[in-house]
Amino acid sequence: QRQMCIRDSFLPTNDRGGASSIPQEWRERTTILLGYVPPDQLKTFPNLKWVQSWNAGVDPYLAPGVLPGGVRLTSAVGAYGPAVSEHMLAMLLAIYKRLPAYRDQQRAHIWADLGPVGSLAGKTVLVGGAGDIGRHFARLVRALGAQRVIGLRRSAGCTVEGFDEIYGLGA
């Protein structure tokens, strides 16, 4: 369930459409929005002062004419790096060490060797995304011995901490 902060009250919304279920009288009283509101709906809040996005990326809000004048926009950049990158590492290691297959065998009371398992030591790791989450993940795999860490991002031409190389997606 998503919540949008409406002045002194919280109005829960269940639809991913954000503000579509908010009555007009609430829209007129709203000064702060928290969560996801489709950019094209921002103009329906005449007294809006601040939008706090749960997303790190807020590019859709930055297009000309989307954000009403004087409205402050903040994002969740930096909020998810450690937790999400640790989860990514856990999933990578589970797959690399064949933990799902061994779990399935254990449930079936089968104790067969599935062959050697690998290590990140000395390997090259490709990371899709070189933002906050990608940088945290790069540090984690490097700490486990990855020899090289390569990052993909929208555009190349810059260095990013924790990565040996950065390539652009050519969008």
Regions from the PLM with identified roles:
Residues 7, 27, 45-46, 67-68, ...:
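Short, well-ordered coil/turn elements that cap or connect secondary structure elements
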Residues 7-20:
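A short beta-strand-loop structural module common to alpha/beta enzyme folds
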Residues 17-25, 39-43, 158-171:
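Short acidic low-complexity segments
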